[in-house]
Regions:
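Conserved catalytic submotifs in the C-terminal HATPase_c
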Residues: 112-119
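Amphipathic alpha-helices that form helix-helix packing interfaces
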Residues: 32, 39, 46, 62, ...
Length: 151
């Protein structure tokens, strides 16, 4: 939690919003650095490698890095951006798929989906995704992430 102290409540809100945006951008960049860096390293290795078996392994790692990057960007777009269309509700299966992909990318995390509604309010989906990300980060040794929501 970030606390910004100011006697001017307007300035405090502006500073807090700016600090929050900076922290969010730092988090997104941090989360994307690993798979994008692995992709760059794989391309460099692929350019110098001549052994067909090693080149095949490089291609598999490149595909894995691209998939992880894509999954994270889709997750971030809905969790922090304006994704989900123009409606007020988002199909719950979209959030379920993003959380499952996030857990799969981290490895050793199983997910259980306990949301009965076919759609959820867009703000609720954003909160659900953020809580799921925090919980997945806390499962450093693996485990089961149970995701639920009710009205």
């Amino acid at each position: 939690m970030v606390h910004v102290f100011s006697r001017d409540p307007i300035r405090m809100n502006e500073t807090s919003a700016t600090d929050l945006a900076a922290l969010l951008c730092s988090r997104l960049c941090h989360d994307m650095l690993s798979p994008v860096g692995a992709f760059a390293n794989g391309l460099e290795l692929l350019a110098t490698e001549r052994d067909p078996a090693m080149r095949e392994n490089c291609m598999a790692l490149l595909e894995q890095s691209a998939t992880i990057s894509t999954n994270k960007l889709k997750f971030f777009r809905l969790a922090f951006g304006a994704a989900g269309g123009f409606g007020d509700r988002v199909p719950s299966e979209e959030a379920q798929g993003l959380i499952a992909a996030l857990a799969a990318d981290k490895g050793r995390i199983d997910t259980q989906w306990a949301v009965a509604d076919a759609t959820l309010a867009k703000p609720a989906v954003k909160v659900l995704l953020n809580f799921a990300q925090i919980a997945a980060d806390a499962l450093v040794r693996g485990g089961t992430l149970v995701v639920g929501a009710e009205r």
